[in-house]
Amino acid sequence: MTRVHRDFCRKATLFTATVLLLSISRGATPISGADDDADRTSGRAGGIWAEIRVIDSDTGRGVPLVELETVNGLKFVTDNAGRVAFHEPGLMGREVFFTVKSHGCEMRKDGFGFAGVRVTPRAGEISNIKIKRKNVAERLCRLTGEGLYRDSVLLGHKPPLPDPLGPGGVAGQDSVQAAIYRDKVYWFWGDTLRMSYPLGLFRVAGATSPIPDAKDPKSDPAGGIAYEYFVDPKSKFARAMMPLAERPEGVVWLEAVFTVPDQRGVERLVGWYSRRKGLEEMYEQGIALFDDAKEVFEPAKQLALRETWRRPSGHPIFYEDGGTRWLLFGSPNPNVRVPPTLQDVLDPARYEAFTCAKAAKGEKPAEPDLGADGKPVWRWQKDLPPVDSKTEQQWLKEGKLKPEHARFCPADAAAPADRVILHSGSVRWNAYRKRWVLVAQQTFGKPSFSGEVRYAEAEHPTGPFGRAVRIVTHDRQTFYNVCHHPFLDRDGGRIIHFEGTYTNEFSGNPEKTPRYNYNQILYRLDVDAPALRAARVK
């Protein structure tokens, strides 16, 4: 390139940039096709506050967990109704550019690659920003924690919950368990954060709520769930549901909550508990029963620490096999069963594992048992440990199992040559699809290592789950211990709801989303959505 050519190119570039910058300074959109300015209307916003609301471009519904950031780094996150109550004295009545981003949603970029919109915030006015949902599942609301409808309250709106700022004094809450018991939904969570001190409750928190009526629009969980927490009468903060006061060392986790009859035929609320030093090391484990008079769980049977599978786990389901009723355990794939009575649940000798292993190496399956046709020989038995998604993935990697024979390690519907390793989730019967549907967290996923959620189907609860469709994605945030609640299903099972723990833990991302971090977020999914066709079992 000659010097003349270089000078011409340099001047042309400067001229183009100058025109674009001048157009921006005058309030024009720099490149055709970029997002328009926010729609402004007079509305309910009152006092000193300007209302900025982010809405789904398809449904018109407010979108929670949307981050708006100004050029100078001020960040705002929408509440459960998709609202931000805005009052920055130096920015009112002035045009402000907000970068807009949200997990599983997108905002079109302008000519410079900025995904955002210009807003002129004025007290008493509403600015609507439209965003496009890319997730198959729709994010509805944050279920736990403080300030659920914080911005809506400031703006004078009436939220759908009796306590819109967060019941139970809870700041953060981890990993849900739920069961219908005595005409209520009983909810239990793991570690629970409080606002009054960095150390929270580490001995199980609990709450109840009415059983929702699928035909009653008022019981639609889209706006949240009206939890009635079990609280300490003095502090009003969530109290311990499994105190174990005589054994104060360690934290207590409660999992696999379900109901079964005892020897008198009385329904009992049961769960597996562990008292632990950390994520891996346990002090003790066992089966716990709910004491209705004390309203706490108490140990009913302690299990040997070396016992890894002859116990409840995951989100239990009931099913029939050959006319015999069973209780199934496993997360996300059901691979352990026991007769559904309290007496059987308390007896490790009554548990059976679903396996295709030839032998065990320690407490893990060693290699697959293949028949004369080269297919794995699956069976229920009492001696060998169960096979799960992680085991199948290892066998696939080692060439010991053919991809078409995988049962718990489905193909990625978008890239069938790749297999999806499932970490936690649930399998439920779906009356609309007339299939067992799996909603589970993927591990070793992208763009988030543990924040991608998958949907798959099977004719049996134990699979095979052939293809999995991504229904939720996160940008370097984690979404784990996913659970689909069948009692929240609507429209005959066409609409299902699931939740999970949203956090920056295990993501490699140091940024914590204010109020949302380490809390439960609810999604709904239309199982008839065209995007799920690749996962359907015909």
PLM features: what roles do these ranges have?
Residues G73-E88:
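Short, acidic Ser/Thr/Gly-rich low-complexity loop/linker segments typical of extracellular
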Residues G47-A50, D58-N72:
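Short, ordered, surface-exposed loop/turn motifs in non-cytosolic proteins
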